[in-house]
Amino acid sequence: MMIRTTDPASEPVTLAEARLHLKLDASGSPESHPDDDLVNRLIPAAREWCETYTGRSFFEQTWQVKLDEFKDDMRLPRPPLISVTSIQYIDLNGDTQALSSSVYTVDTVSNRVLLAYGQTWPSTRSVENAVTITYQAGYDSGNSPQDDTAIPSAIKAAILLMVGSLYENRQEVMAGLSFSEMMGNSTVRSLLGPYMVDKYGSV
């Protein structure tokens, strides 16, 4: 099981970029457009669709993965992996323990948590979700994690195209038509194709 515990602090595409793509003139004061609220809702919707389609995290966000037991090689979903914040487990007595970082290594290239040399995993109680791994994922840009230059340009282009499709079909969106029914845009899929993660978590 996996859950996102912290959403991205901002979006890969700004309102100004979306306006430019949609050819919406800023006509209000301060510079605004009557559809700004709608576009601001469509941007995260488009980003989430593209993240789900590729199996990636675009901007820095926090995830938790819950496992029934430790494994020697644990691949973390929704790459790229930035860092592992903590690993907790339920011991044989039923108490929650924090695992020392000396027991494992983190490979941010392959998005994996590995057992460190000479170490052994602690015993866990035989219950569901006995192990919880909390980690940061997303395109990291050092001191400025929300710097959009860390996002591949093809992904930004796909999000903008998705925003455009959602905006053009906003009546269908409001009527509840699903993205999968509406999104036949082969260009979006072609742009995202190189960034898709396979079912084993490989990139």
Which residue stretches match the model-derived regions?
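Divalent metal-cofactor coordination and adjacent catalytic microenvironments
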Residues: M1-V203
